[in-house]
Amino acid sequence: SLGKTIKKLNVKYTSLNCDVNDYKRIKNNIIKLKKLDILVNNAGTNIPEPFLKVTGSSLETLLNVNTKAVFNVAQLCANQIIKLNKKNGSIINISSIFGLVAGRDRTVYSMTKFGVEGLTRGMALDLAKYNIRVNSVCPNIVLTPRTKKYFANKKYNKYVKESTPLDKVATIS
């Protein structure tokens, strides 16, 4: 896990694993932090659907998790970084390759990740005066316990490998 990797580097970190739609809980956790230098803003979900079949429920879920929650966490953390650390900070929004290019049956997902890209660029401009750097990371499809079932499909696996420059699937460590 990322936590194990960070521990090996002998770096102090706090991991907040919570429902990103629970604004009050997130806010309460963030304002309790005594030190905050870096945010890795990693919230996201995907509901693959053809555009003409997208339901109101899936639209709302994707907007809330992929865009609204990313905004809320970033804003809360930026305010806390400014309050606690007058020198500098860094916010890294985890986006997606689908925030740069569209994907079939990923219209809403792409829309939300394009939103993260716009948010990141706007934040970078607004937070520069506080010496807070803001960037995004746009991975392709990542093999996780949640996505493992898709990789069992040979056609899907081939598609992912062919759409990745290094001809291999990203994994989490």
Predicted regions: what they are:
Residues 17-27, 56, 172-173:
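The beta1-alpha1 cofactor-binding region of Rossmann-like NAD(H)/NADP(H)-dependent oxidoreductases
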Residues 50-51, 58-63, 160:
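Substrate-binding pocket helix/loop in short-chain dehydrogenase/reductase
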Residues 52, 101-107, 129, 167:
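Active-site loop immediately N-terminal to the catalytic Tyr-X3-Lys motif
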Residues 74, 112, 120:
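Active-site helix of classical SDR
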Residues 79, 125-129:
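Alpha-helical segment proximal to the catalytic Tyr-Lys
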Residues 96:
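Residue(s) in the substrate-gating loop at a strand-loop-helix junction
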Residues 164-173:
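A conserved structural motif in NAD(P)-dependent oxidoreductases
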